[in-house]
Curated annotation (Swiss-Prot):
Protein name: 6-deoxy-6-sulfo-D-fructose transaldolase
Biological function: Part of the sulfo-TAL (or sulfo-SFT) pathway, a D-sulfoquinovose degradation pathway that produces sulfolactate (SL). Catalyzes the conversion of 6-deoxy-6-sulfo-D-fructose (SF) and glyceraldehyde 3-phosphate (GAP) into fructose-6-phosphate (F6P) and 3-sulfolactaldehyde (SLA). Can also catalyze the SF-cleavage with erythrose 4-phosphate (E4P) as acceptor, forming 3-sulfolactaldehyde (SLA) and sedoheptulose 7-phosphate (S7P).
Organism: Priestia megaterium (strain ATCC 12872 / QMB1551) (Bacillus megaterium)
Record family assignment: Belongs to the transaldolase family.
Quaternary structure and partners: Homodecamer; dimer of pentamers.
Keyword S-adenosyl-L-methionine: no
Top-level class of the enzyme under EC nomenclature: transferase
EC number per UniProt: 2.2.1.14
Active site: K89 (schiff-base intermediate with substrate)
Record's catalysed reaction(s): 6-deoxy-6-sulfo-D-fructose + D-glyceraldehyde 3-phosphate = D-fructose 6-phosphate + (2S)-3-sulfolactaldehyde; 6-deoxy-6-sulfo-D-fructose + D-erythrose 4-phosphate = (2S)-3-sulfolactaldehyde + D-sedoheptulose 7-phosphate
Family annotation (Gene3D superfamilies): Aldolase class I (3.20.20.70)
Record GO terms (molecular function): aldehyde-lyase activity; transaldolase activity
Length: 226
């Protein structure tokens, strides 16, 4: 399974790339806002930081106010020219899907986002989108069981040998990462703190303290590993 970082903060991305071996980045307008920097400044930073780095997709979302395919294609084409790493992120609406089809014709990779059902996930795969992003956290917050919905998308894609990669998005904790892995999703994208939490466990800390105490009480005749 691939790990993408859901962030627009360069310091977080750099740390995760260097230390966690993340495979890509996803952004959205909210993450851009939280970075405290203008949209184009963030894109310029990304393009510079990862220039020459291959197979490291960075999903950049177009202006969410655009509501027709022509305008989406026009803006997305300009964004794609800024970096070979950029993937154009577009909403799963009818105009968005029409735009995605045109992008793929032009050889521009797309990430169809804001997907909340298997039926929505079908058309992105049919038109050859590079990625599709079904959301988990928002649905679970409303009381929905998301495990089966992700499994259904995975199974449908297998039935028809679709090449679109599934990015399970809006994850809130380590359990949701595991659920996505068990369902067979290709990728998860999480915030910095969610990954940090997923690397930890209370019993790991408990066991480490016990081993430290044992180490400190071990009598040795000579210093070890000086």
């Amino acid at each position: 399974m691939k790990y993408f970082l859901d962030s627009a903060i360069l310091e977080e991305i750099r740390y995760a790339y260097e230390n966690w071996a993340i495979d890509g980045v996803t952004t959205n307008p909210r993450h851009i806002m939280n970075s405290g920097k203008p949209f184009l400044t963030v894109l310029d930073e990304f393009a510079s930081e990862f220039k020459g780095v291959e197979n490291f997709p960075i999903s950049v979302e177009i202006n969410p106010h655009l509501d027709n395919a022509k305008d989406m294609v026009e803006e997305g084409t300009k964004i794609a020219k800024l970096s070979s790493n950029f993937v154009i992120k577009i909403p799963c609406t009818e105009p968005g899907l029409i735009a995605a089809k045109e992008f793929e014709k032009q050889g521009i990779s797309t990430n169809v986002t804001l997907v909340f059902s298997p039926s929505q996930a079908l058309q992105p795969a049919r038109i050859g989108a590079k990625f599709v992003s079904p959301f988990v956290g928002w649905k679970e917050n409303s009381g929905d069981d998301t495990t089966q919905y992700i499994q259904d998308i995975v199974n449908i894609y297998k039935n028809y040998n679709y090449n679109t990669e599934i990015i399970v998005a809006a994850l809130r904790n380590g359990k949701q990462i595991v659920d996505a892995a068990k369902a067979g999703a290709h990728i998860v994208t999480c915030g910095f703190d969610v990954y940090k939490e997923s690397f930890q466990h209370a019993f790991t800390d408990y066991g480490l303290n016990k081993f430290r105490n044992a180490w400190d009480n071990t009598v040795t005749e000579a210093p070890v590993l000086k």
